[in-house]
Design a protein with these regions (language model features):
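Class I S-adenosylmethionine
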Residues: 2-88, 102
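Ordered hydrophobic segments in well-structured contexts
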Residues: 36, 173, 212-214
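Surface-exposed beta-strand edges and their flanking turn/coil or helix-capping segments
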Residues: 40-42, 49-54, 108, 134, ...
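Short, well-ordered turn and helix-capping elements at secondary-structure junctions
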Residues: 41-43, 123, 199
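Short, surface-exposed alpha-helical recognition segments that flank or form part
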Residues: 48, 152, 179
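The AdoMet/dcAdoMet-binding core of the Class I SAM-like
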Residues: 54-167, 173, 183-187, 208-210
Length: 217
């Protein structure tokens, strides 16, 4: 049966999947926004998220020299990875996500398998701890670790931030994606203040409803 509501709104649901990490993930195809993933009431990958990262990474491009090594913590469906690959075609790109389900959906619907990235299904905290112990360094680290609307507190901990800093090259940048509406605003301001204790410089950038916290080692 034709869903006239979806027909007239210009969007359709391609698939719904239950993830043990993110809960229900809905894959939506929209005439206006293309294909995107919705988790709860937020777009997780594709659609407006793609535009947010495109704006952000073009800003970052003017702040960092050509990166040899990029680490994305919270790969999701791969929006950030696709844009990074286009902006820096010769970089070594690593994407980490704990949710295998959303990674597989990214390959199926958003072209993640065409990005030429090392994809690691792992806990971001443990991964960063491991690479920092190995003294592995990245010129650009992107931290996008929301589960729905929640940013797990472990990724605000001293231990995590210390390991991220260790994994960052001397002239590198780390970008934290944070929500910035309602009750999220004071949480993000508090986190911004904490970052200033770990990094020599912390700037903020507003692409739409989010705020990006851009840190220099």
């Amino acid at each position: 049966m034709i869903n006239f509501k979806n027909l007239f709104s210009g969007q359709s649901v391609l698939e719904e999947v239950d993830s043990p990490i993110n809960g229900k993930i809905t894959v939506v195809k929209s005439l206006a926004l293309g294909t995107y993933f919705q988790v709860g009431k937020l777009t997780q990958s594709g659609g407006v998220v793609f535009d947010i990262w495109k704006t952000t990474l073009n800003k970052v491009r003017s702040m960092v020299t050509e990166p040899n090594n990029i680490l994305i913590l919270g790969l999701g469906g791969g929006s950030c990875a696709k844009i990074s690959r286009k902006l820096w075609p010769y970089t070594h790109l690593t994407g980490v996500d704990f949710d295998k389900t959303i990674v597989e959906l990214g390959k199926k619907y958003l072209g993640l398998d065409e990005v030429n990235a090392d994809i690691v299904v792992s806990d971001a905290y443990e991964y960063v701890k491991s690479v920092s112990n190995e003294k592995k360094e990245y010129n650009l680290i992107i931290v996008d670790l929301y589960v729905g609307q929640e940013f797990p507190v472990i990724f605000e901990s001293d231990g995590f931030l210390e390991n991220v800093k260790k994994a960052l090259s001397q002239n590198g940048l780390v970008v934290f994606n944070r929500l910035y509406f309602g009750e999220k605003r004071p949480q993000t301001v508090k986190f911004f203040n904490k970052l200033q204790k770990f990094f020599s410089k912390v700037e903020y950038f507003y692409p739409e409803a989010n705020v990006m916290l851009i840190c220099t080692k």
